[in-house]
Regions:
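Aromatic-Pro/Gly-enriched surface loop or interdomain linker
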Residues: 32-114, 120-121, 222, 230-265
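An acidic, glycine-rich "communication" segment
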Residues: 59-65, 150-237, 252, 256
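Surface-exposed patches in mature extracellular/periplasmic domains of secreted proteins
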Residues: 92-103, 145-149, 167-175
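Short alpha-beta junction capping motif
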Residues: 51, 109, 114-155
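Bacterial N-terminal signal peptides
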Residues: 17-28
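N-terminal secretory signal peptides that target proteins for export/translocation
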Residues: 1-14
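A generic secondary-structure signal for well-formed alpha-helical elements
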Residues: 91, 141, 163-167, 262
Length: 265
């Protein structure tokens, strides 16, 4: 079972020490990550917490390290391997060592409190998927969206507005519980993708970072959208000496906060 051992109540100074320690151990976390099983296997989660990455129909492909995958699978499996290793290292959450890939219409969806859509600029959900996601979120689920930039916003906004036509995408304030539950996220540093750091700087970020969210009637955060950021890349490249460790550490902090919020709200 998930235990936080009072860490959410620790003073800011101590949490800053934890943050500094995270910088020193990012590579150790990456080196200690596990090999994944077939992500479509299994009827139930393997532990109290297991990430479910959402599959969606797309012909577009992208990736790094010479591997091109469907847009929903970009950064797999390195992102999950490294992040789940960090989650196990810094919390007492009972965390599975593998992940799941599910369609929104999969009946197993409701067994996973935290789901992830990567590259939502290429996400065009069907009516059945829209209905399933709305029900999932209103029944207590949590959705993170990551790695979309610039003009991707319009496609994402069209999709998410079909899920919640009556709810506004709002700026997530720094004092939101999701930003303070474990680490105090009082900075808004932009997390670049690997492609933004290579090629002689020719690939530029397409705007400032934005944290957008959708809340339910009790002001529970159901959706977090990391716009003009690439948290998945920061996780994936934790073992890459060419990717800045401070960015990976910050991405770990965000992800850990999101997970703990999803499990406790």
């Amino acid at each position: 079972m998930m235990r936080m051992d009072g860490q959410a109540q620790r003073p800011k100074v101590l949490r800053r020490i934890i943050t500094a320690g995270m910088l020193a151990s990012c590579l150790a976390v990456a080196a200690g990550s596990q090999n994944f099983k077939d992500p479509t296997e299994g009827v139930r989660p393997d532990a109290d917490f297991q990430i479910a990455r959402i599959m969606y129909a797309t012909n577009a492909r992208a990736g790094s390290r010479g591997i091109a995958q469907p847009m929903w699978a970009v950064d797999y499996p390195g992102a999950e391997e490294h992040f789940l290793a960090a989650l196990r290292r810094y919390t007492n959450v009972d965390t599975a060592e593998d992940t799941r890939h599910l369609a929104l219409t999969d009946e197993r969806l409701f067994q996973y409190p935290y789901i992830w859509i990567q590259q939502p600029g290429y996400w065009y959900p069907t009516e059945k998927e829209v209905a399933a996601l709305r029900e999932y979120l209103l029944r207590g689920g949590f959705l993170m969206l990551d790695d979309f930039h610039g003009r991707d916003w319009g496609e994402f906004e069209n999709a998410i507005s079909r899920v919640f036509p009556d709810r506004e995408l709002m700026d997530i304030p720094k004092d939101d519980p999701a930003m303070q539950i474990f680490f105090d996220i009082d900075q808004r540093t932009q997390i670049p993708g690997d492609r933004h750091l290579r090629y002689g700087g020719q690939v530029q970020m397409e705007g400032p970072p934005e944290w957008k969210g959708i809340y339910d009637d009790d002001h529970r955060l159901m959706v977090i959208a990391n716009y003009n950021m690439d948290i998945g890349d920061a996780w994936e490249h934790a073992d890459d000496p060419g990717y800045p460790l401070p960015m990976t550490a910050f991405a770990y902090q965000l992800g850990i906060n999101y997970v703990l919020y999803a499990l406790t709200h």
